[in-house]
């Protein structure tokens, strides 16, 4: 998990990395589903949006994702938003407030990383 200090990073929580340090992912990647990569995606990065994290390659997403704490429309068109937090944003806010970071990239030490205990997918 990472949560950054800079203007971009302090407004999101990243997860889904099996290594816990921002370098892990699945063996396969998926096509980035956003407009700058030729795919229409009308979901805006508003508070509570869940989106795929990726490296510089637009088709490099695998298991990592991020939750947007504050509206971040500058991400629209370049990251694949795919859902929204429907309850529990107060927990996202608490994590952003209380979890200490160790560097300007927002890295959180393993012993301080929150654990997602339950996710429910709804239509």
Predicted regions and their residues:
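Glycine-rich, pocket-lining loop/helix-strand segments that form or immediately flank
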Residues: 11-43
């Amino acid at each position: 998990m990472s949560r950054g200090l800079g203007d971009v990073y302090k407004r999101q929580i990243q997860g889904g990395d099996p290594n816990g340090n921002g370098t892990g992912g699945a063996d396969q990647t998926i096509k980035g589903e956003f407009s700058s990569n030729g795919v229409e995606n009308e979901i805006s990065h508003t508070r509570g949006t869940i989106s795929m994290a990726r490296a510089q390659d637009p088709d490099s997403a695998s298991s990592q994702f991020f939750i947007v704490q504050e509206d971040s429309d500058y991400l629209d068109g370049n990251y694949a938003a795919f859902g929204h937090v429907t309850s529990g944003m107060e927990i996202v806010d608490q994590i952003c407030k209380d979890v200490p970071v160790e560097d300007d990239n927002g890295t959180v030490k393993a012993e301080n990383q929150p654990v997602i205990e339950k996710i429910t997918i709804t239509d």
